[in-house]
Amino acid sequence: TDTSLADQYFRKYFYRKGFKDFNHYVIPLRKMFKLWELDDKVYTSILTNKLIFERYFSRSDLRLAKILAYNENSVFFLKDRVIQINTLSEFIDLLRILVNERSLTKGIFIKKTEDSHGGRNTFKITDADLVSDSHDLNKLFDEVRRSGFLFQELVIQHKLLSNIYPGSLNTIRFDTYTDRNNITYLYS
C-alpha cells in the first residue's frame, strides 16, 4: 500500500462528498520524487525563506502578513532604522514597541526566517507575555539572536476558521507541478 495516500486523504479533503476520482488529485510517491527532481533549486529560496517570499510576492499585490521587523543575529531591521540589540531588556523594549503599534491585535508573530513551517520556530507575543515571567522571553531572545527571524503583524483569523482549532492559523496550500513543456498542473 501507498502510505502517502492516507496522508493525502486528509490533506486534500478526499473525505468530502463530490470527489469522483481521487486519482486526479493524488500525487503518488514515485511522481512526488519526480517532482522533486524537476524542482528548480534556483527558486527554492523564494519559497523557503519567509523574508524573500514576502519581498518577492508583495510586488504582486498579494495579501501577506506585514513584516514589522526582521533580524540577523543581534542586528534588527525596522522600517526606518537598523539597531543592535544585545540585552534582554532591549529586546523586550523592541517587542513592546512592535506590539503596541498593533492597536487592533495587540500582538505579533515571531517566525524563524527559514525552517518555521507547521508552527515550528513560530511564537506569538501579546501584551500579556511582556509582563509575565521573563524566563520564556529570555529563551526566545537567546533563540532569536542566534539566527534570523521575522516579526510580523498578528493575523486575526475569521471566527469560523478559528472554530476549527483556535490554537492554529489555518492556511490554504496549493500543490502545483510544471512539466518540461512548461504546462502547470494544480493538484490540490
Q: Where in the sequence are the language-model features?
A:
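Short, amphipathic alpha-helical segments
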Residues: 47, 51, 85, 89, ...
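Short, solvent-exposed loop/turn segments at secondary-structure junctions
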Residues: 73-74, 114-117, 156-157, 179-181
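Short His-Asn-centered micro-motif
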Residues: 47-48, 111-113, 152-154
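Short, solvent-exposed polar/charged micro-motifs at secondary-structure junctions
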Residues: 75-81, 118-123, 160-165
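Phosphate-binding site of ATP-dependent enzymes
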Residues: 105-108, 133-188
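Glycine-rich phosphate-binding loop of ATP-grasp-fold ATP-dependent ligases
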Residues: 74, 105-137
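Conserved N-proximal alpha/beta basic substrate-recognition cap immediately N-terminal to
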Residues: 1-97, 116
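Residues at the C-termini of beta-strands that transition into short coil/loop
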Residues: 68-71, 126, 155, 178
